[in-house]
């Protein structure tokens, strides 16, 4: 329908959790059709892991869509959370790094490039999906960003760290002190840092 109506690149599939339960033959036909239509994808890993397969006996369905295959096909895949502190997902915080963390585990996306792609799924990819202009760190962009207490994107997903600064249009609008951990054992005072340098 997307191609027939000339809407290529303007349609987004949210959740797509049914793809988790589709047989491989059907998906082998569906994904190329999605590529042809330039469909964008928003997976909701935390909600889908909690809600899908809830009433299954074993084996239980994971429920998250086929993120690895969709990314490999070149589709723009983003992660989100659509249920925050509600009856469906009372533990969701709205933190997209939680969504990326869950996706890494649920989707077996543990290769370094895959984990970096998961970080892009909560940063660059959603901006592209929304058609945001002036997004990014290039000269002339809007300077809307969040400074994390992490050395790289993989550490950001692993730690879900302190947001040191939230910057909007080049102005700091929120900030938090750096997280520090102190170890105080008899005769061995020390501090530890979970962030790799």
Mark where each language-model region is.
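Active-site core of metal-dependent hydrolases
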Residues: 1-65
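His/Asp/Glu-enriched, well-ordered alpha-helical/loop segment
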Residues: 2-10, 47-51, 61-148
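Short, glycine-/Ser/Thr-/acidic-enriched flexible segments
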Residues: 18-19, 46-49, 84-85, 152-153, ...
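Glycine/Thr-rich phosphate-binding loops of Rossmann-like dinucleotide-binding domains
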Residues: 21-22, 50-51, 113, 156, ...
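Residues at alpha-helix caps and immediate loop-helix transition turns in enzyme cores, especially N-
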Residues: 26-27, 92, 159
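Active-site microenvironment of metallo-dependent hydrolases
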Residues: 116-197
């Amino acid at each position: 329908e997307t191609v027939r109506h000339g809407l290529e690149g303007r349609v987004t599939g949210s959740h797509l959790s049914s793809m988790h339960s589709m047989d491989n033959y059907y998906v082998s036909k569906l994904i190329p059709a999605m590529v042809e239509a330039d469909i964008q994808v928003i997976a909701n890993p935390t909600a889908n892991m909690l809600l899908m397969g809830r009433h299954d006996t074993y084996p239980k369905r994971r429920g998250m869509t086929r993120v690895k295959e969709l990314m490999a096909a070149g589709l723009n895949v983003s992660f989100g959370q659509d249920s925050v502190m509600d009856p469906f997902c009372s533990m969701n915080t709205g933190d997209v790094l939680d969504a990326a963390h869950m996706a890494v585990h649920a989707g077996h996306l543990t290769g370094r490039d895959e984990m970096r792609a998961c970080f892009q799924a909560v940063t660059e990819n959603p901006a592209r999906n929304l058609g945001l202009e002036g997004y990014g760190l290039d000269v002339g962009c809007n300077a809307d960003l969040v400074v994390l207490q992490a050395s790289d994107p993989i550490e950001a997903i692993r730690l879900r760290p302190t947001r040191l600064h939230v910057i909007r249009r080049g102005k700091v609008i929120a900030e938090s002190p750096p997280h520090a951990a102190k170890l105080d054992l008899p005769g061995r005072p020390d501090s530890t840092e979970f962030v790799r340098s």
